[in-house]
C-alpha cells in the first residue's frame, strides 16, 4: 500500500482527529436536522441550487466524519428491513413513472437525507439525538412564532418569501417558516413528543423543558 509523505500524513491524521471528534459529530448532526426542518425556508430564500449546495457539503462532511471514526462505530440496532424495502420500491418506480427525471430528482433528494439520517443514528446515542432535535425544534418554532407576530400583529402584512400570510391577527391558521399549516402542525406534534422525552429523561432543565412544551402546544393550537 502506498503511504503518503510524512508531512501529508500529519495533516491527514489531524483532519481525521477533528472530523472524528464528538464536537464535530454534534455540529454536523445539528446542521443536518436544521437543514431538514428549514428546507422550505432555505429553498425560498437562497433557491434550489443553494439548498443543493448545502446538502452536497453536508454529505461530503458526514462521509469524511464517518470514515474518520468508522472503527469506533457499531450498528446499534437491527437493519430497518421495511425502510430498505420501501426505498428500493421507490427507486423501482422510476421505470414506469411518466416523469422519470422528476422522480429521479425527488428520490435523490430522499437518498441524501437517508444518508444524513444514517450518519446521525450511527454517531449519536438516543439522548443525544433527542437533544439535537429538541434544540433545532425550539429554534424553528421560536423563529416561526416571532415572524408570525411581526407579520400579523406588528406590521400587519405578509412575508411572501417564506409564504407567511400574517394570519395571527385574523385568527386564521398560521404557517410559520414551513409553508403550510399542516407542515407546521406536524412539526409541532413531533416537537411535543421530543420535549416530553427531554422532560422525562431529565436531559434538560425542568423549567426549560416545560416552557418548550408550552411553546409547542401554542404553535400547534395556532396552526389549527
Q: Which residues fall in each region the model found?
A:
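Transmembrane signal-anchor hairpin modules in multi-pass inner-membrane enzymes, especially those
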Residues: 1-92, 128, 135
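Short hydrophobic alpha-helical membrane-embedded segments
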Residues: 26-34, 82-84, 107-108, 184-188, ...
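Hydrophobic, membrane-inserted alpha-helices
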Residues: 35-39, 61-62, 87-90, 113-116, ...
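Membrane interfacial helix motifs at helix-loop boundaries and amphipathic/re-entrant anchors
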Residues: 37-55, 92-109, 148-184, 221-224
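Hydrophobic core segments of transmembrane alpha-helices in multi-pass, intramembrane catalytic enzymes
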Residues: 52-62, 105-117, 182-198
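Structural signal for the C-terminal ends of transmembrane alpha-helices
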Residues: 60-73, 118-128, 194-204
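Transmembrane alpha-helical segments and their membrane-water interfaces
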Residues: 94-148
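Alpha-helical transmembrane segments of multi-pass inner-membrane proteins
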Residues: 134-162, 169, 176-224
Amino acid at each position: 500500500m502506498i503511504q503518503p509523505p510524512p508531512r501529508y500524513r500529519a495533516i491527514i491524521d489531524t483532519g481525521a482527529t477533528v472530523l472524528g471528534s464528538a464536537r464535530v459529530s454534534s455540529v454536523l448532526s445539528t446542521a443536518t436536522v436544521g437543514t431538514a426542518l428549514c428546507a422550505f425556508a432555505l429553498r425560498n430564500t437562497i433557491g434550489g441550487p443553494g439548498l443543493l449546495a448545502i446538502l452536497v457539503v453536508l454529505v461530503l462532511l458526514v462521509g469524511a466524519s464517518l470514515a474518520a471514526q468508522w472503527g469506533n462505530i457499531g450498528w446499534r440496532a437491527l437493519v430497518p428491513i421495511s425502510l430498505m424495502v420501501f426505498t428500493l420500491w421507490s427507486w423501482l418506480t422510476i421505470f414506469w413513472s411518466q416523469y422519470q427525471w422528476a422522480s429521479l430528482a425527488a428520490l435523490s433528494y430522499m437518498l441524501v437525507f437517508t444518508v444524513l439520517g444514517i450518519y446521525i443514528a450511527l454517531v449519536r446515542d438516543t439522548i443525544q439525538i433527542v437533544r439535537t432535535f429538541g434544540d433545532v425544534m425550539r429554534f424553528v418554532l421560536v423563529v416561526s412564532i416571532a415572524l408570525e407576530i411581526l407579520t400579523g400583529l406588528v406590521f400587519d402584512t405578509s412575508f411572501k418569501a417564506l409564504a407567511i400570510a400574517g394570519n395571527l391577527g385574523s385568527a386564521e391558521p398560521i404557517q410559520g417558516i414551513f409553508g403550510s399549516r399542516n407542515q407546521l402542525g406536524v412539526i409541532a406534534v413531533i416537537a411535543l413528543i421530543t420535549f416530553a422525552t427531554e422532560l422525562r429523561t431529565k436531559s434538560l432543565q425542568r423549567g426549560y423543558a416545560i416552557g418548550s412544551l408550552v411553546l409547542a402546544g401554542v404553535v400547534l393550537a395556532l396552526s389549527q
